[in-house]
Swiss-Prot record:
UniProt similarity note: Belongs to the alpha-IPM synthase/homocitrate synthase family. LeuA type 1 subfamily.
GO cellular component: cytoplasm
Protein name listed in UniProt: 2-isopropylmalate synthase
Subunit-structure text: Homodimer.
Region (Regulatory domain): 408-536
Encoding gene (name): leuA
Naturally occurring in which organism (per UniProt): Rippkaea orientalis (strain PCC 8801 / RF-1) (Cyanothece sp. (strain PCC 8801))
Length: 536
């Protein structure tokens, strides 16, 4: 009996593998926000974390399972090494979900067996079915990954996969652990598994790959042609080292070129049925959300979601696009949710108009969140004559995506000029409720502000990234500031938007410091190293 779907299953691992990007650490609430966005996007499976790694990871997976893992929502997955403790913890974390999955893994390449696991092939052949069967006794849906499959002996790999499926694995995931394979090699690997594992039709073939050579998306598309039906990917392609296969690139490649891919899924070439369940109009907003919460900027020339993806500077190209978009565009910007930047509200607009427009833009906010965002909107509308959709998105993102306010910025004031020494005065409310004021001089106004804040907060850190960009055109445009701080080999991000760049810079810095300070407070929590799962 075949277990193969006639569409592609999208398995999102932004909250697990994506979070392993340096500096992409997220709070539980931020993970929940992203999970809700992924559910709106229409992903089939959310790998919400590695529950055994830390109490924070366990809490995040459990909360996502409770809140997002509804009957009509995505399947919620927890990662686990092939040990009983890991598997039991993962099962407990995903238990609240209507549809839960355990994803367990064990390396199969000789180099991993010899140097990391220190186990023989026979031992691995015994461990895999035992642990898969144990996972199956706790949940109905089990996925197994042979780590470093690309460098494993094919005959041994086939044996491992056959035993995993016989023990109850419903999905077999093939990882390109170090992003080494080429498309033809990866396609042949999947084709070999399809032909040589006797019970492979009882499981779905999944692929997971890293982008070290920039080939992850190409490898996955070749895998689809050879029988893969689940793609493990991340928003914006974030992940360990050079990242993972980018969800938006895979989905839009399958969407735009579905006539090419249809026959590989047993469909007539002319079929217009979508190949995935993804609501493509949610792609851009989800990309922005992940970028802002992780502090990882999207490069301007990034396919699909980059700032320049639908921009045409060449006069010949501009002329062609104006006459007919299809001359130089293979997809419509609106198909990924990139709307025209229309003017929608002004300072006389009321709360109902504000709420209605946010709902039209896809924001689902509580009454408290609406009230907070409306106050910010009024503040901006007093300074800026016309408020556009992009302004609204920046306002909501700024208000909703701040870290818990341990320190609160009450006042920032700067003095600078051609022949003046830049000076800043700041007032902060501390976690214990005190209001402290201090001042500092710097090489520029932002430097002076940050030095003044540091005198109050007194948490040593290194500013490693500072970026500013305008939300819209015009001299009165809002500016977005994204920063990243390093403290003891960990990186913390901050984001803020304001018509005043100095204020936005101060708020972004406080946001990052609040994450840093909160992390220091939580350092007593025991955490298992994630290095073993970094490449899965």
């Amino acid at each position: 009996m075949s277990n193969q779907p006639d569409r592609i299953i999208i398995f999102d691992t932004t909250l697990r593998d994506g979070e392993q990007s340096p500096g992409a650490s997220l709070t539980v609430e931020e993970k929940l926000t992203i999970a809700r966005s992924l559910a709106r996007l229409g992903v089939d499976i959310i790998e919400a974390g590695f529950p055994y790694a830390s109490p924070g990871d366990f809490e995040a997976v459990q909360k996502i399972a409770q809140t997002v893992g509804t009957e009509d929502g995505p399947r919620i997955c927890g990662l686990a090494r092939a040990t009983q403790k890991d598997i039991q913890t993962a099962a407990e974390a995903v238990k609240p979900a209507a549809k839960g999955r355990i994803h367990t893994f064990l390396a199969t390449s000789d180099i991993h067996l010899q140097y990391k696991l220190k186990k023989t092939r026979q031992e691995v052949l015994a461990i895999v079915p035992d642990m898969v069967a144990y996972a199956k006794s706790l949940v109905d849906d089990v996925e197994f990954s042979p780590e470093d499959a690309g460098r494993s002996d094919p005959e041994f790999l086939y044996q491992v996969l056959e035993r995993a499926i016989a023990a109850g694995a419903t999905t077999i995931n093939i990882p390109d652990t170090v992003g080494y394979t080429t498309p033809s090699e990866f396609g042949a690997l999947i084709g070999g598994i399809k032909q040589n594992v006797p019970n492979i039709d009882q499981a779905i073939i999944s692929v997971h790959g890293h982008n070290d050579l920039g080939l992850a998306v190409a490898n996955f598309l070749e895998a689809v042609k050879n029988g893969a039906r689940q793609l493990e990917c991340t928003i914006n392609g974030i992940g360990e080292r050079a990242g993972n296969a980018a969800l938006e690139e895979l989905v839009m490649a399958l969407h735009v070129r579905r006539q090419y891919f249809n026959p590989f899924l047993g469909r007539p070439p002319e079929s217009t049925e979508p190949l995935t369940n993804i609501n493509t109009k949610e792609i851009y907003r989800t990309s922005r959300l992940v970028s802002q919460l992780t502090g990882m900027m999207v490069q301007p020339n990034k396919a699909i979601v980059g700032k320049n993806a639908f921009a045409h500077e060449s006069g010949i190209h501009q002329d062609g696009v104006l006459k007919n978009k299809l001359t130089y565009e293979i997809m419509d910007a609106e198909s990924i949710g990139l709307t025209h930047n229309q003017i929608v509200l002004g300072k006389l607009s009321g709360r109902n108009a504000f709420r209605t427009r946010l709902k039209e833009l896809g924001f689902e906010l509580s009454d408290t969140e609406i009230n907070n965002a409306f106050l910010r909107f009024k503040e901006v509308a007093d300074k800026k004559k016309e408020i556009t959709d992009w302004d609204l998105a920046a306002i909501v993102n700024d208000e909703m995506q701040q870290a818990p306010e341990l320190f609160r910025l009450e006042l920032v004031q700067v003095s600078c000029g051609d022949h003046a020494c830049p000076t800043a005065t700041v007032t902060l409310r501390t976690p214990d409720g005190q209001e402290l004021t201090d001042a500092a001089i710097g090489t520029g106004p932002v430097d002076a502000v940050y030095k003044a804040i540091n005198r109050v907060v007194q948490v040593p850190n290194e500013l490693i990234e500072f970026s500013v960009k305008s939300v819209t055109a015009g001299i009165d445009a809002m500016g977005e500031v994204t920063i990243r701080l390093r403290y003891e080999d960990k990186i913390y991000s901050g984001y803020a938007a304001n018509t005043d760049i100095i204020t936005a810079s101060a708020r972004a810095y406080i946001s990052a410091l609040n994450r840093l300070y909160g992390s220091i407070q939580d350092q007593s929590a025991t955490e298992v190293t994630k290095s073993e799962v970094a490449a899965i």
